[in-house]
Amino acid sequence: MYRLNAMIFFKELIAFILSAIAGAALCGCAKPGDQPQAGFDTYFPMKLSEKEFQAQLAIEPAEKARGLMFRESLPEDGGMLFAYDIPQKASFWMKNTLIDLDIGFFTADGTLTQVKRMYANNLDSVSSARSDIAYCLEMKAGWFERNGITPPAKLDMPLLKKAVDARKKK
C-alpha cells in the first residue's frame, strides 16, 4: 500500500513539474514591447483643439449600449468617446445615466460639427444633425463651453488612432 501511494505521489509530482515548466515556457511567448489589450475602463489621453482630456473608448456594440450608465460622476476632464467604423447619423439617450452630459459629434477627420446637451435619465433621443458622424464625445455638461470648444474644433487624430489601436489590439 505504501509503495502504491509513493508511486502515485511521484507521478503527480512529475506532472506538476512538467506543467510548471510548460507554463514558464509559454510566458515567454510574448514579443518584447508587447502591451496587453486595453480594456473598456481604460482612460486614454486625448486632445481637442489645444485642450487635453482623458476618455474611455466605446468601440464594441455592448460598450456603446452601456456608455456612461450608472455613473455618479466623471473626472473634470474625463469622458467617453464612441467610435464608429462607418460614419452615420448618431443618436443617444440617457436611460440610467445619472449625470447631465454634453455630446460632441465629429466627422471621420475629427472635425466637431455640433454640441448638444443631454439630461440625466431623459429617454428622448438626442441625434446628430449630420449623417457623416464617426465619433461622439460625451463629457460633463458645460465642458465644451467652459473650455471654449466650438465647431469646427479638431480632435488630435494621431492620439485617437493610437487609443483605438490599443483597444482593438489582438
Question: Can you say where each PLM-predicted feature lies in the sequence?
Answer:
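Bacterial N-terminal signal peptides that target proteins for export
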Residues: 4-17
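C-terminal motif of bacterial Sec signal peptides marking the signal peptidase cleavage site
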Residues: 26-28
